[in-house]
């Protein structure tokens, strides 16, 4: 049985709330809510991993060496390794947002207060990352590459495509079938349900997960998903690392790291992480 957790509360005040939702090798995920003037990070760089931000409410300013991006609601920002960056809440309202680090690279321990092993450094004298590689993508079909676009039935949009992480958006009509049960040998699969509910099939059990649920499936665990509900459902899908998932959806990566369920049933689904995002 997959149980829905609530994550690990790191800090909770009216001005700033930080909850660690996922802390596995392939991904660290933090949900945060911050008032203007709080949650500000200094300019920094990650040498070996990428960072992504999604804004639910309010706005963030993503500062790079040569420009500033305003990240509003329903928008992703993706920062590759070696790119100097910082972010802070902008405007007059609180911001609610999700922070991903892929791979984890010690971020879980970092937010707990142990920074020694985390892959983060002050900006070098000569930065090597090109700030033009930073991606900012609005969701809901507004931006990105639509792989499938049948509004009443199914829309699949690639938002971020990088070695460290692929982020896609799935919008499925009532009763629309998703992926049949399968496994990934060498990478993790994840979902964040945004609207409605998706049914996730994990080994021999099925679980309907509502909006606001984050699910991370480690390598070797059998899983699939459908929209079994009578309403539209929308989610983000993550592959960590990418392994060419976007090309797989385009039909140009037949060797993608995806296999039918093994005869032994795959690995124990107890390692699956399911967390409800805080309001």
Task: Describe the residue ranges of each PLM region.
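A short, N-terminal "cap"/entry segment at the start of jelly-roll beta-barrel domains
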Residues: 1-28, 36, 42, 112-166, ...
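Short strand-connecting beta-turns/loops that link adjacent beta-strands
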Residues: 25-26, 48, 92-93, 164, ...
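Short, conserved beta-strand element in jelly-roll/cupin
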Residues: 31-35, 45-63, 100-102, 169-173, ...
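Structural motif
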Residues: 52, 59-61, 68, 84, ...
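Short acidic-glycine-tyrosine-enriched beta hairpin
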Residues: 66-81, 204-222
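A short hydrophobic beta-strand segment most commonly corresponding to one strand
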Residues: 78, 92-109, 216, 230-247
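Asparagine-centered strand-capping/turn motif at beta-strand->loop junctions
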Residues: 88-90, 226-229
């Amino acid at each position: 049985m997959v149980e829905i957790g609530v994550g690990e509360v790191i800090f909770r005040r009216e001005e700033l709330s930080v909850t660690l939702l996922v802390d596995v090798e392939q991904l660290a995920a933090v949900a945060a809510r911050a008032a203007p003037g709080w949650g500000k990070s200094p300019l920094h760089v990650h040498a070996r991993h990428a960072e992504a931000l999604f804004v639910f409410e309010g706005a963030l300013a993503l500062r790079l060496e040569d420009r500033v991006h305003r990240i509003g609601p329903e928008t992703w920002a993706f920062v590759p390794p070696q790119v100097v960056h910082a972010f802070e809440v902008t405007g007059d309202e609180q911001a609610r947002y999700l922070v991903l680090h892929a791979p984890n690279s010690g971020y879980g321990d970092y937010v707990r207060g142990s920074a020694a092993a985390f892959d983060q450094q002050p900006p070098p004298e000569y930065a090597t990352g090109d700030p033009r590689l930073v991606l900012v993508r609005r969701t809901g079909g507004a931006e990105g590459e639509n792989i499938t676009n049948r509004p009443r039935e199914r829309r699949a949009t690639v938002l971020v495509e990088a070695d460290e992480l692929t982020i896609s958006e799935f919008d499925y009509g009532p009763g629309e079938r998703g992926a049949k049960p399968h496994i990934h040998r060498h990478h993790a699969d994840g979902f964040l349900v945004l609207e409605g509910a998706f049914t996730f099939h994990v080994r021999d059990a099925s679980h309907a997960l509502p909006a606001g649920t984050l699910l991370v499936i480690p390598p070797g665990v059998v899983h699939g998903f459908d929209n079994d509900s009578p309403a539209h459902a929308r989610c983000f899908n993550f592959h960590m690392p990418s392994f060419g998932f976007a090309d797989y959806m385009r039909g140009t990566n037949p060797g993608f790291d995806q296999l039918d369920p093994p005869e032994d049933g795959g690995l124990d689904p107890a390692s699956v992480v399911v967390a409800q995002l805080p309001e």
